[in-house]
Amino acid sequence: MDGNRRVRFNTDRRPYLSPLQTSFPSSTSFQTPTFLIEEDDEDTEDDDGPQVLPVHRAPSPAAFRKRGSITSMDQYLVNMPAVPSPTASKVGLLDARNTDVESYAASYKTQSSSNSVNSLPMRRPTLDRSYSAPMIAAKNLQSDPEKMSNVESTNELPSTTTEAYKLVAAHTAARLEHMRLNALKAANDEGEDVKDNEQDDNIDESDPFANPKASYRGGVLSNLLKLYTNSNTVTSSRISLKHTDPTKWQKHAKRTASSNSLTDLLHASNQTFMAPASGLQSTEEIPQFSKTGHSRGRKFNFHHHSRKNSGLNEEYKITIHLADILQRQKYILKLCRALMVYGAPSHRLEEHMASAAKVLEIEGQFLYIPGCMIVSFGDVNTHTSDMHIVRVNQTIDLGRLKLVHDIYKAVLHDRMGVEEAIRGLDEIFKSPPYFRTWILVVFYGFASATILPMSFQGGWIDLPIAFILGCLVGILQHYIAPRSTMYNSLFEVTGSIITSFLSRAFGSIRYSGGRRFCFSALAEGAIVLILPGYIVLCGSLELQSKNIVAGGVRMFYAIIYSLFLSFGISIGAALYGWMDHNATDSTSCPVSTQMDDKWKILFVPLFTLCLLIVNQARPSQWPVSIFISCAGYVVNYFTAKHFGSNPIANAIGSFAIGCLGNIYSRLGRGVAFAAVLPAIFVQVPSGLAAQGGISSGIEVATSLTNNTYNTSSSSTLDVNSLKFGLVMVQIAIGISVGLFASALVVYPFGKRRSGLFSF
């Protein structure tokens, strides 16, 4: 500030609040300061004299506690004491000023403590981590501006609304620095017309290149930038100076800049301490400096200007719009996590998420890789993006997957709001599994027992042993593997080693000159629920749908996973062969112990039921899944009898399964994926046993224990060790071709609004 100017405060006793303007009596009369700018006698020629410095006052906190429309808030506005500029600290009147502010705070605290609703008023945050006046808390804020008339004083806000309010409040406080810089720039530009600048800042709405896409909402950044770039909010940074002679402006540029600096500091300090009225302050135009005579010692009081609530309404609109965008993005992320966790078809995940984002008018890009989804929310107004990574451990839960799909469809067809959908997804996440762990372990045993007759040529005598081995695998997977991260990485290998060792031990038991149990059937049936059939199937489907990254990664992992199982079978069988030289080396079951084909069809619904329970399917999903599974098995059985080629039989069987599932989804409004998946699991063990995938590991183990592994047979054994993985790939390719063909038949043009929730 100039050395030739002095700021003096004049304190006139004035009542701060009247009983008509507030709901509580004010026992203290506060002093409202007025400023007197004095100048020395050095510059007497062409002196502009003292100038009025306006101070924008914030409304009383009692006004925000009133119920009623926002548009009628003018009647509650009161004159709050203006906070002096920091440049006036040398005057020595700040102590008296602070005393008045403390008195007002004490009276407000007394009234707040008497009110049970407003006992702890929230504070308005700023970018410098400080807090200013009490924050306006609104309950049940909705996206419709007309429904915002009931402004309540409560601290319980939705998470997205609170986050949006904090963002708007912080950037409103940060706008003070933006205003100060614009004011200094306007003061330093000689002869610049401010009105022309305001016209240049306005965007031509008729320009098609200036407007973003109408089908998408703006992002978070574009809504926050409205606080800076909107013409209604930046007018306070434009200062209109009343000077007609440019030479006089240049002559007194130093003194004018000093006055402008004082004005900006007063305005900034007033907004900092009275932050709730920042929306009102931003809509006012700083008045022109009045030019008076050279009379020294004249006092000038602050003018009382009528407040406009358009800025406050604009801030409310930005806050609500920002909260709505954050809530929609939160729903999309939660939906993505739920679909991945509960086992949605991975090759259609990107399509599902794109459909959900399009309906919600959110611009989003999605990239799926196994176990991870990269989500990018774009902003068409600012050409920026907000990236999120959703990383989960994918499992299969058919029951909760159906619930997630119901929420997904309800939001797509406007039968459910986003807020209700988020609550529904949270409840699904928090809900316990439908079946307890010990029930899953028991049905692991039943699944191993029921798969033997129809896929691995097992007999009635083999069923109890298969049940014991299956329960052992279930205990390893559900009780031991989750407790140890190190063991979880070796679960497949150790499980196949233990079951293969015990299977050969039971198969070596002699009875009446022959073998009592079938070694190959027990070894294959024990690990049926940990076969990588679903992994290979998803990989082949992703490759067929041109998702090369996810399909290639998953297919390679499935092959390595298959080699792990084959290696475990070989090690387990070889260990028992090393201990017992009379161990069995048969890779097939005797014909005398095998069941008749007419009995095998009875085990298909039993095995399907075990799969449904293991995969947490609800009882309402059982009948359709069992019917589709039986139909697929019948088609596969007779096709294999006719063609003699197992890949062709798998393709035709999966085609029948896919057609039935998609028809059920189209007519019955069900989830085709949940109905089809157990039927696909029935196809995998049959094809694997028909092509001798598991028996290759048994052959390697037999060669090792009998010391027949030499240089001449090394190439044959190496091929056999890879046969398990290659057989799994062949089966998956046949099944994926049939499933894609079935989707093309039932949905020749796809689904227009939502993605196809099937294979």
From Swiss-Prot:
Localization: Endoplasmic reticulum membrane
Highest rank taxon of the organism: Eukaryota
Membrane topology type: Multi-pass membrane protein
Keyword Transmembrane included in the entry's annotation: yes
InterPro entries: ThrE-like_N, ThrE/Ser_Exporter, ThrE_2
Biased composition (Low complexity): 17-31
Region (Disordered): 1-31, 188-211
Membrane-crossing segments per the record: 434-454, 456-476, 486-505, 517-537, 555-575, 597-617, 620-640, 643-663, 670-690, 726-746
Gene Ontology CC: endoplasmic reticulum; endoplasmic reticulum membrane; membrane
Residue stretches of biased makeup (Acidic residues): 189-207
Keyword NAD: no
Keywords: Endoplasmic reticulum, Membrane, Transmembrane, Transmembrane helix
UniProt GO MF annotations: amino acid transmembrane transporter activity
Recorded family membership: Belongs to the ThrE exporter (TC 2.A.79) family.
Name of the protein in its database record: Uncharacterized protein C7D4.12c
